[in-house]
């Protein structure tokens, strides 16, 4: 929604933490400078940077509620939508979970193209590209675990439980705190 977009203006969020920290190594990302400039432009104008949604991104947004219901059924849990969560009262760092689960968990849903979903099913693990997002969401939301779900309505879903990686989160926290300083 527009209100949700306004809350995110100028704030690094977990979905873009890979632009600050590299997924596989946990080292600073080469795209951090460009990302900082985008966020500064948002902060100065009060407007989010325009991002062109691909058809698959749009499809993912449209299918998220269906995927969340599937997750609830498959995992026999109740989930709660949360909106934007800030790391602390400074409101400089955030995450937007697809859902919070129980007292200690969260959920990240992806609804990719069929060939990508098949790859995720075969690999049966958190794709490396999403490590910063998932570990970052646990850091920001103060959760102990996060489920990564890949959903395609014509195939079985993939749900992978990911636990906190404290050394990775410590590196991430240092880089992101320096990024917003």
Regions found by a protein language model. Name each.
Residues 73-97, 101-180:
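Nucleic-acid nuclease catalytic cores
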Residues 26-27, 66-70, 146-149:
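Intrinsically disordered, low-complexity boundary segments flanking structured domains
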Residues 1-62:
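Charged, glycine-rich intrinsically disordered N-terminal tails and low-complexity linkers that flank
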Residues 37, 68, 134:
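Generic structural marker for isolated residues within well-ordered, non-membrane alpha-helices
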Residues 57-79:
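Acidic-basic catalytic patches of nuclease active cores, encompassing PD-(D/E)XK
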